[in-house]
C-alpha cells in the first residue's frame, strides 16, 4: 500500500495538498453560524444526487410529466423517499442560503477585500431562486402550470421588450410543451452547471482571503 501511495506522492505531491487543506487558520470568533454556507452546499449536492436519480423515470412532456411523477412516487423502489428528500433539501437549501446571507451581512463579510465573494454569493442566490421557479413547474400539475404562466407573464409589463421576453421564456406565445422543455433544460443542466461554477469561484475566494474577522 505504501508503494502505491509513494507512486502517487511522487507525481502529485498529495501530502503537500493535504497539509494545505488541513492547516488553514480558523479565527477564534468562528461559531456554528459560519457553517451555514457549507450546509447550503451540502443541500445542493443532495439535490444533484436525488435529481439525477429521478431523471431516469421523469418524462418532460405535457402529457406524461404528471404521470411520471406519480410513477416515481408509487411504483419506483424508494421513489417516494428520493423525491421527498429532493423537496425537503430544496426548502432547506433556500432557508440556509437566506440565513447565510444574513450572517454575512451582519458580520460585515461583504466589505473590502471580499466584494467579489459577495457578488458571487448574490449570483448564487439568484440561481437558487431560479431552481425553485423551474423545479416547481416540472410535475406539470395545476399549481405548476399556473405558477409558470404567472411567472413567465411578469416581463410582459416591460415596455417594448416585454412581449419578446415572454415568448423567449415560454418558447411560444402560450405556455405549453416548449415551456416545459425550456424549464426542464434549465433545471437539470444550465442552472446546476452555473451553480457549480459560481460555487467553485465562491469557495476559492474564501479559501484565498480567509474568513472575515469579527466586527
Swiss-Prot record:
PROSITE patterns: CYTB_NTER. InterPro entries: Cyt_b/b6_N, Cyt_B6_PetB, Cytb/b6-like_sf, Cytochrome_b_N_euk/bac, Di-haem_cyt_TM. It is found in: Plastid, Chloroplast thylakoid membrane. Heme b 1 binds at residues 34, 100, 103, 202, 212. It comes from the Eukaryota. Heme c binds at residues 35, 207. Its cofactor is heme b; heme c. GO terms for cellular component: chloroplast thylakoid membrane; membrane. Keywords: Chloroplast, Electron transport, Heme, Iron, Membrane, Metal-binding, Photosynthesis, Plastid, Thylakoid, Transmembrane, Transmembrane helix, Transport. One of its GO terms (molecular function) is oxidoreductase activity. The chain crosses the membrane at residues 32-52, 90-110, 116-136, 186-206. Binds 2 heme b groups non-covalently with two histidine residues as axial ligands. GO terms for biological process: photosynthesis; respiratory electron transport chain. Pfam families: Cytochrome_B. Heme b 2 binds at residues 83, 86, 187. It is a multi-pass membrane protein. Heme 1 (or BH or b566) is high-potential and absorbs at about 566 nm, and heme 2 (or BL or b562) is low-potential and absorbs at about 562 nm. The 4 large subunits of the cytochrome b6-f complex are cytochrome b6, subunit IV (17 kDa polypeptide, PetD), cytochrome f and the Rieske protein, while the 4 small subunits are PetG, PetL, PetM and PetN. The complex functions as a dimer. Component of the cytochrome b6-f complex, which mediates electron transfer between photosystem II (PSII) and photosystem I (PSI), cyclic electron flow around PSI, and state transitions. Belongs to the cytochrome b family. PetB subfamily. This is Cytochrome b6. It comes from Spinacia oleracea.
